[in-house]
Each structure stands twice: as structure tokens, then as C-alpha cells.
Regions:
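Non-catalytic, surface beta->alpha helical segment in thiol-disulfide oxidoreductase systems
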Residues: 94-142
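Local sequence-structure signature of Cys/Sec-based thiol-disulfide redox active-site neighborhoods
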Residues: 31-66
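Conserved strand-to-helix beginnings and helix N-cap segments that scaffold or border functional pockets
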Residues: 52-57, 84-85, 123-124
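N-terminal leader/targeting and pre-domain segments
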Residues: 1-37, 138-141, 145-149
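Short acidic (Asp/Glu) patches
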Residues: 84-97
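Short, well-ordered amphipathic alpha-helices
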Residues: 58-60, 88, 134
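Thiol-based oxidoreductase modules, predominantly thioredoxin-like and allied folds used
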Residues: 23, 44, 67-86
């Protein structure tokens, strides 16, 4: 049974304020994960302490990396059941895990940070792990060339 929305709204906002788009239905998940060719982070949010104390702050810090994913989306385990179930179908070879962070590239899963890799770890350790995945799988966005002075 899903939690009351007023209880989890602040947990949702932790990611939304970072630029994450919430996916609340299976169709929304398919619209993004089924067609997106850019690098995409999928945060599997949850109410547990390791999400609040590790995953969400770790993700926030990781986004300060120079190289980062192009698209940020989230599903909320235990709340948006249909969306979470559909997202997990894209994570071939991994059992359901929440919280978790998946990195997709060209529609394929290239990295997965599971709950057992989040529990008991400091957010900065989680951020470093995610940054390493971004550095390996994401592209640097070239800066615009400087225009000559007029």
C-alpha cells in the first residue's frame, strides 16, 4: 500500500529540486527509457533511511561533477508502483532494489548502484562512485567557443 503523499512529498522534492523528472506511470517510463539515446540517470527513490541519508544526498553531490548524465529521472518505490515495476524491467540482470541508481546509455543499462552498495556508506562515497560511472559512460559537453572581442 502506498504511503500518504504528504509524507513522501519532501522526499520527492529532494530529487525534483535537482532537476529530476518524476515518472509516475509505466507509459512515462517507456516514453523516456524506451526512446532516450542520451545518458540517463534513473534514481529509484524510497522512504528508507539509506535513501534519505545516502542515496539522495550522494546523487546531489555527484551532479556537481564536470561530466554528468544528460537526463535525470526518478521513480518512487513503494509509491509509484507501476512506474517502478516498469523501470525495473529495463534493469536486466538486477533484482529489484530500492533505493538504487541506474545509468542508461543509448537505451541500455551500463551501470547500477544497488541498495547494498548504498547502505552504510557516506553520501560522499556514493557521489564518488557515481562520478566514476559518469566519467566512464557520459560525454563532456563541449563549451561554446569564445567569441572575439568587437
Amino acid at each position: 500500500m502506498p504511503y500518504p503523499e504528504e509524507l513522501i512529498a519532501p522526499m520527492r522534492q529532494d530529487l525534483v529540486q535537482l532537476g529530476f523528472q518524476e515518472l509516475k506511470t509505466a507509459d512515462q517510463v517507456d516514453e523516456v527509457l524506451g526512446t532516450e539515446q542520451r545518458t540517463t540517470v534513473v534514481a529509484i527513490n524510497s522512504v528508507c533511511g539509506c535513501s534519505a541519508g545516502g542515496m539522495r544526498p550522494g546523487v546531489a553531490v555527484s551532479l556537481g561533477n564536470e561530466i554528468k548524465p544528460d537526463v535525470l529521472v526518478s521513480v518512487f518505490a513503494g509509491q509509484d508502483l507501476e512506474a517502478t515495476e516498469r523501470a525495473r524491467e529495463y534493469f536486466t540482470g538486477y533484482p529489484p532494489s530500492s533505493p538504487a541508481v541506474a545509468l542508461m546509455k543509448n537505451g541500455e543499462l551500463v551501470y547500477m548502484l544497488e541498495r547494498h552498495e548504498i547502505e552504510g556508506r557516506h553520501p560522499l562515497e556514493i557521489a564518488d562512485t557515481l562520478k566514476a560511472a559518469y566519467n566512464e559512460h557520459c560525454s563532456v559537453i563541449p563549451e561554446a567557443p569564445e567569441l572575439p572581442a568587437v
